[in-house]
Design a protein with these regions (language model features):
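Structured catalytic-domain cores with a bias toward divalent-metal coordination
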Residues: 1-371
Length: 371
């Protein structure tokens, strides 16, 4: 009986990683003013058998640390000897932002608006170029991990092109409560990666600067489910005891269930609605049972109509109807200034966690079904 020939090593960063092995590399980015090197950390897991090449990245914004923990836990559960294909994991893309405790780079550029970048451009452009040439350009599928901004929390959700059948199948495999059809933004990692032909899932969950278990645990399982859907791992080998959802409900109108008694529904005012745990349970997340993810085709932020203190009556994952009273704004004397009302029928996919707001501040992000 002839032996199967050994899989060729994977050349990366000047190193050849043998089949069935893992290697940690640091790709040079720049230097600090002290002369200390700044490098991009990359884990290479080169499977013993052939399969796709996939990347997972986190902390493209320096305050989005939950993704770093997701990558750590995913790597704990993966063995390259059981892997088919190759995984490139980048736990921190915006190294300088993380070092400085800042969402952005020292030059105040948003790294996620700097792709595909240039080898001779700004610092942001150079980091983007390094990611594109060394990581993204070698992969057919990618998962980019994000959280909400400072003092904003997000319901776990996948943002992607739901009109592409292959991308949608991977999004369904991930198993997040919300699948959000999101347009591509110029300069984003996702847009640049799509130009290479790669399918990309963007996972949004939790809040900046926090290890929210309700965001991390589903993210870990979701990444592993995608690898299983690509036949890169066997579910039992990576601790997946339950498969992801096998059906997606594309709701044409309000979701089943009654409006909670304490909430009042008004006739909608004339507004522009187009504007814009391990039991992983956030204290606010998901009102009632939910068997399948929500498909979200549009969204709107409800904004503050006055300056003051906001009290919100809706939680992440809660269903609302246009016109519902979902909170109120008060002044410092405790007098109510305005009701906060839903401008769209759908599900709460994000909300502010800041009690002090100014007129025009984003309060509640609602995802809706209508295209």
């Amino acid at each position: 009986m002839s032996r199967r020939p050994a899989r060729a090593p994977f050349a990366f960063g000047g190193v050849e990683v043998a089949a069935g092995r893992r290697h940690e590399l640091s790709l040079p980015i720049s230097q600090l003013v002290t002369g200390a090197d700044v490098t991009l950390p990359v884990h290479v897991l080169h499977g013993r058998e052939d399969g796709p090449t996939v990347w997972v990245s986190a902390a493209i914004h320096g305050d989005e640390v939950a993704g770093v923990e997701i990558v750590r836990r995913v790597l704990e559960r993966l063995q390259p000897t059981q892997l088919r294909g190759t995984l490139l994991a980048v736990p921190i893309v915006n190294v300088l932002g993380v070092m400085a405790g800042d969402r952005y780079l020292p030059d105040r550029r948003d790294l996620n608006r700097s792709f595909p970048g240039s080898a001779r451009g700004s610092l942001a452009s150079r980091i983007a170029h390094l990611m594109m040439t060394e990581v993204i350009g070698r992969c057919t599928v990618g998962i980019d991990l994000h959280t909400g901004a400072d003092r904003r929390s997000n319901l776990p959700q996948i943002r992607c092109d739901l009109e592409d059948p292959q991308t949608r199948a991977l999004a369904e495999a991930f198993g997040a409560p919300v699948l959000f059809h999101a347009r591509l933004r110029d300069g984003s990692l996702r847009a640049a990666a799509r130009e290479t032909g790669a399918r990309v899932l963007l996972y949004e969950a939790g809040e900046a600067w926090r290890f929210d278990e309700y965001a991390i645990a589903p993210g870990v399982d979701g990444v592993l489910r995608v690898l299983a859907a690509l036949d890169m791992v066997d579910p039992a080998d990576v601790g997946l005891t339950e498969p992801g959802p096998d059906a997606v409900v594309d709701a044409p109108g309000p979701l089943p269930g009654e409006v909670p008694e304490e909430r009042t529904t008004d006739v909608p005012e004339a507004t522009d609605a187009t504007g814009e745990d391990t039991e992983a349970v956030h204290p606010d997340v998901v009102d009632g049972e939910q068997d399948s993810p929500y498909l979200v085709w549009q969204s709107t932020w409800v904004r503050a109509r006055a300056d003051g203190l906001v009290h919100l009556d809706v939680s992440l994952g809660e269903r609302v109807s246009a016109g519902d009273r979902i909170g109120a704004l008060y002044n410092s004397f405790g007098r109510r200034l305005a009701h906060v009302k839903a401008e769209l029928t759908g599900v709460v996919i994000g909300r502010t966690e800041a009690p002090l707001v100014h007129r025009g501040d984003a309060l509640v992000h609602i995802g809706g079904w209508d295209t």
